[in-house]
């Protein structure tokens, strides 16, 4: 059976691994997931990720999760905003700081996938993929 929301599945895997206090989790690979993981690493929500070859055509990403000094996950909230059944778009003027700049919006724009902060600076709107804090 095919997966209807691969990005939502990736977020759920990361969220569940964090709650179970796992050091890593494995997510199926794609270009958009790689872009999202790059932004999560850049914003400090994950330590790192690496590509793992499944076979000649498919690859997975091994995500290294990040925890604070009390062993609580750094990612407190990881929510899919725009789903395949309900797309959510936002204009650049409507992009506001999320959770008083503690959280981050990930937006898919015409210039690629970027944080809400960068999209606002470049005056680009787009589809709100997820929000995290």
From Swiss-Prot:
InterPro entries: Ribosomal_uS8 (IPR000630), Ribosomal_uS8_CS (IPR047863), Ribosomal_uS8_sf (IPR035987). GO terms for molecular function: rRNA binding; structural constituent of ribosome. Belongs to the universal ribosomal protein uS8 family. This is Small ribosomal subunit protein uS8. Part of the 30S ribosomal subunit. Contacts proteins S5 and S12. It holds the Pfam family Ribosomal_S8. One of its GO terms (cellular component) is ribosome. It comes from Leptospira interrogans serogroup Icterohaemorrhagiae serovar copenhageni (strain Fiocruz L1-130).
């Amino acid at each position: 059976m095919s997966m209807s929301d691969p990005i939502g599945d990736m977020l759920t895997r990361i969220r569940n691994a964090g709650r179970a206090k796992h050091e890593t989790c494995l997510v199926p690979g794609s270009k958009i997931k790689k872009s999202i993981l790059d932004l999560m690493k850049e914003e400090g929500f994950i330590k790192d990720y690496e590509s793992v070859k499944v076979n000649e055509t498919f690859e997975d990403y091994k995500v290294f999760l990040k925890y604070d000094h009390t062993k609580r996950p750094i990612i407190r909230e990881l929510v899919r905003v725009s789903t395949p059944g309900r797309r959510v778009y936002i204009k650049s003027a409507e992009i506001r700081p999320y959770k008083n700049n503690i959280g981050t919006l990930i937006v898919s724009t015409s210039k690629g996938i970027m944080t809400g902060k960068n999209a606002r600076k470049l005056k680009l709107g787009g589809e709100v993929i997820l929000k995290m804090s």
